[in-house]
UniProtKB/Swiss-Prot annotation:
Listed name of the protein: Suppressor of RNA silencing
Family of this protein: Belongs to the virgaviridae suppressor of RNA silencing family.
Keywords: Coiled coil, Host-virus interaction, Inhibition of host innate immune response by virus, Suppressor of RNA silencing, Viral immunoevasion
Family matches, as InterPro entries: Cys-rich_furovirus, Viral_P18
Pfam family, one: Viral_P18
Gene Ontology BP term (one): symbiont-mediated suppression of host innate immune response
Its job: Suppressor of RNA-mediated gene silencing, also known as post-transcriptional gene silencing (PTGS), a mechanism of plant viral defense that performs sequence-specific inhibition of viral mRNAs expression.
Coiled-coil ranges from the UniProt annotation: 86-116
């Protein structure tokens, strides 16, 4: 296998050292081998998106995904420790705050349209706009419910793990 198509730059002459260079290098390896780029999926399952191209080793000409120091070890510790729950709670809370702000904005618009004095030309459009806004409020409310359910699930799993009668945590080395 030749290294002609692999990423190289001045900062990674002795091998890729930064996350950015490792990512570019891995993408170039995937492309050189004619493979589709496989993104790191482990943290996405935990509610945090990494997007780093997954590391692999070739075994009998076939790529086998593996963990490494740039991405895998970080995620390995992240998953084993349960620290991902905090990040997932933060992202779900941020999403919930955004949805609540959007819902308040929509309700204010509905109230303004319902109570406002409008010229006759605008009155023809008010019912359509109200219907559209009410449908959007319904969608936002549904998304909020999904987000709240996700928050409850994460908090429940954290509480089960912290319960005094829970089984001892066994950390296995990979």
């Amino acid at each position: 296998m030749s290294t002609v198509g692999f990423h190289t730059c001045a900062s990674c002459v002795d091998g890729p050292k930064s996350i950015k260079c490792v990512s570019k290098y891995r993408i170039s390896v995937y492309k050189t081998l004619g493979l589709d780029v496989v993104k790191c999926r482990l943290p996405a399952d935990c509610g945090v998106n990494c997007g780093m191209p997954a590391a692999f080793v070739l075994e009998q000409g076939h790529p086998k995904l593996t963990m490494d120091g740039y991405c895998g070890e970080k995620h390995r510790g992240y998953v084993l420790s349960g620290a991902w729950r905090h990040a997932q709670l933060r992202s779900l809370n941020a999403e919930l705050d955004t949805l609540e702000a959007r819902e308040e904005s929509l309700r204010a618009q509905i109230k303004a349209l319902s109570a406002g004095d409008h010229c006759p030309a605008v009155l023809a459009y008010v019912p359509k706009k109200l219907t559209k806004l009410k449908a959007e409020v319904h969608d936002v409310t549904g998304k909020k419910q999904v987000c709240i359910t996700g928050l409850v699930d994460v908090m429940d799993s954290a509480l089960v793990r912290l319960a005094p009668d829970s089984p001892p945590k066994k950390i296995s080395s990979l």
